């Protein structure tokens, strides 16, 4: 299938699904046949999902310049990961905590590892908070994602033995099924594997930020997302803030 045809398919399909994402979330049975056909078509119209490892170099360079010109917290609680970290106003949400936020772009775990020295090691953290769901959303398997988390954490432990790590669960979004048929399921599988991994290590702590995003009927709260259906709006982060505060407080040195 030509790249032009593939691009046109996704442009039209995304337009439809984005316009109906909230209704789909609330009434998925109405769209069962349409979504099934869409997923079948995705097997024909295959997107190029290759990631250039240094695609966020300009963002990292901006961090380098900022770090060189400003006094940063010593031994901060370091937030790293993808766009959910970027958009999180951590300085406001956790005022009084020594926070450094080094999320960038829609970073995948291999990209975080690639820029490890810039976004993690140089900051000498007293605690690290990690969030990244990009790999699964980009079609990678739970095994790929878990292994990437393990690689990142292993490298961190070599430099910062026994420093606590808060590993955030992968959040559901309104457009998981638009990304692909297995994305929502693979996020849940990944979360279960991360729980097992965290339980095997004394310095690693799994934080469930998914449950507060669901209503009493088990449906995802549509009102907590930006219009893109993927990123949290300010209301959405108010559901994360108390969960993370409790997790950080439980691990901070007295």
Describe the function of each predicted region.
Residues 160-164:
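A short helix->loop->beta-strand "cap" motif at the edges of active sites that frequently abuts
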Residues 143-152, 183-191:
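Charged helix-capping and loop-helix junction motifs
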Residues 172-254:
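Catalytic His-Asp segment of secreted/periplasmic serine-dependent ester chemistry enzymes
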Residues 1-76, 90, 95:
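N-terminal secretory targeting modules
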Residues 49-110, 229-234, 238-239, 249-250:
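Mobile, glycine- and charge-enriched loop segments
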